[in-house]
Each structure stands twice: as C-alpha cells, then as structure tokens.
Amino acid sequence: MGGKLIEAIQELKALSRGRVTSTPLPDDDFISEYESEVGFLFHEEYKYFLKHASNIFFGTKDPLVVTRDRTDRSELRNAIHEGREFGIPHDWLPICEDNGDYYCITPNGQIRFWSGNGVEKESWKDIATWVKEVWIAEG
C-alpha cells in the first residue's frame, strides 16, 4: 500500500486521539464477501482505508462502513442503493455521505464529489489526498 495513504491515516488517528466508533473494522475475507454482495470490486486503496480508518471518529466527516449485520446508519450498501437512485454514476463507489451529498471513488482511484445537483468539479487524486484535504482540513 502506498506510503501516502498510510501516512494520512496515521495523521488522522493521531488527530482523533484514538476516538473510534463501535463499528468493527472489516478483514480481507469480509471485504471480499461484501464486494460479491454489492457487485462492486473495491479499489485496493479503499480496501486498506476500510480496514484501517473506517471507524475513526474525527471532525464532521463520517465515512461509510461495511458491517456484518448491515444495519449501521452509515452502511455502504445502503449508500450505494440511495446514491444510484439520486443519479450517482454506476461505476462510482460512495465512500462518505455528507448531508445527502457523496464523496465517491472512481474506477481510476480518484475521489469525486457528487451533490444532489449532480456531478461537481471537485476532485482529489486519491484517498490519501481526500483524507488530508477534506477530512482532516475540515475536521
């Protein structure tokens, strides 16, 4: 995994002072099962993010999570379904919901912002950049 993402997550963990949600972090087997269930192959950086940062409690961003019981209010499966109803492109995967808008990872690993008004111009080259410029900066 790229050092940039590892570094961004370490910074996020330090800033959160160890605060995490009660949602357990997924392992590789569960992520693979979840991918099959939702019909979407996750980008490798997103898998790493899920396993190491999806339960961090910091600032105002609330990343989407994958859970065994599928009932969390920030459940990825639900966001995929809702996002598709609102017009998110089918090859974009929501990673964070923000007041009805979504940050999504595209097939090339770029993060794009999608609002209820449609595709926005805001984008970040990868998850690490999004963590630093959005989650941490707006925290």
Which residues are covered by each model-predicted region?
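A surface-exposed partner-binding patch
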Residues: 1-104, 138-139
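A short, charged
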Residues: 128-139
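Segments surrounding the PLD/"HKD" phosphodiesterase catalytic module and close analogs
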Residues: 101-129
